Amino acid sequence: MSLRPPRPGGIGVRTPLIDGIDKVTGRAKYTADLFAPGALVGRILRSPHAHARIVAIDTRAAEALEGVHAVCTGDDTPVPFGVLPIAENEYPLARAKVRYRGDPVAAVAAVDQATAERALALIEVEYDVLPAYFTAKAAMKAGAVAIHDDKPNNILREVHAEFGDSAAGFAAADLVREKTFSFAEVNHAHMEPNATLAEYDTERDGVTLHTTTQVPYYVHLKVAACLQIAESQVRVIKPFLGGGFGARTECLHFEIIAALLARKARGTVRLLQTREETFLAHRGRPWTLVKMKIGLQRDGRITALALEATQAGGAYAGYGIITILYTGALMHGIYDIPAIKHDAWPNTTPSATA
């Protein structure tokens, strides 16, 4: 194969991927490949509990450690974020409560990895551990402790929609079948772990982020909102990306945390996450229980289709607030179905992942 760009052409001309040559030759630079002289190392302290109140956080020893340039907690992040304005219920660093094992509690920026790790070890956090529920059904049971105070039944959002007369459609069917399907939680397992390089500009009081995202403009908006600065003070650059598959279609907490650390340290911070942390921060396909009912005529025509879906949406709304709509919006496919009924409940469950 030639490593030269293809000649211009149309039909019949072999056209490789526009970025393929850079990738196969190793010229492509990913976020973790970017080097910034003097960059500090960012690290995140995460909750060991699935659900707990934060009673107290003491960062004084970490702040006093030589080589530490910044320490941030939930006190530095008063603005929540989320994929939609109706579901902004997550903070970059936990405030008052943690809602999954791995929820970010504090973050540090230090001169090197060893110093950053020592600083994390010096941060003291007192927790009041609360009940945790690891299935959607358990979280929805009567008497279950609310994960979010404004959602006492742990149901994030209910979706109910009907098009046509489903009852009449089932009555007219020659055959009605019902079946329940259980879909396991799936992590996208993209090859590149999460990473952000955040640079603070003292002259314009702004930040520039190079980050592993599929949606740089969305990251731009959320970083500005959480840092409480103008959008014009934030620049987001998307380098080559080692996979995403939907897991990086929203702003994630580590991107905002990197920006916070860079601003507080008034410098540059590289925040590289381990594979375990990337799994903890993932926005994978949620566990979903689907009960489907279909009405058919003898000639194969569908008379009605009904779906009930219960989804373990995780500790925060995230993209799940949209995913639950897909369970119904996409179920008809290319078929001619005169009546469709869709009922869905995404719920919040404190768990091992977000």
Language-model segments: what does each one mean?
Residues 89-116, 246-298, 354:
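Glycine-rich and small/hydrophobic secondary-structure elements
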Residues 44-72, 106-127, 196-265, 322-332:
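Alpha-helical support elements that line or immediately flank enzyme active sites
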Residues 74, 233-239, 266-276, 303-308, ...:
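Beta-strand segments within the central parallel beta-sheet cores of soluble alpha/beta enzyme folds
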